[in-house]
Amino acid sequence: MMVAQRALFDTNILIDYLNGIPQAKDVLTEYHINPAISAITWMEVMVGAKKQGPALELKTRQFLGQFLLLPITDEVAERAVELRHSQHVKLPDAIIWATAQVGFRTLISRNPKDFGTDNGVLMPYRL
């Protein structure tokens, strides 16, 4: 029997899902137990939805409601600074990555340029 991983989804996976990318739907289905996102991911997705008008904004809010929203705590902030310095990633990516690490979750992304390749980040597909 497989033990389900506790997942934290990167912004690109959620945007792919909202854009109808089948691989994103598969990943969200596979890691459906207690899925989480960073507050940064919530903000990034909602900024895009708000530009599309009230109907899509509401639909997106409802979609995001299925995820546990993890805050930027002091511990996440400290870890993000370390990751930003040591891994040379953009600050929003460092915060998302730190949120996963502090919460003992597997970060699921499809963008190796954001996180490198040998780093514990799961990249189930690429576009």
What role is predicted for each listed range?
Residues 13-14, 41, 76, 95-96, ...:
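Alpha-helix capping/helix-boundary segments
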Residues 86-92:
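Donor nucleotide-sugar recognition loop
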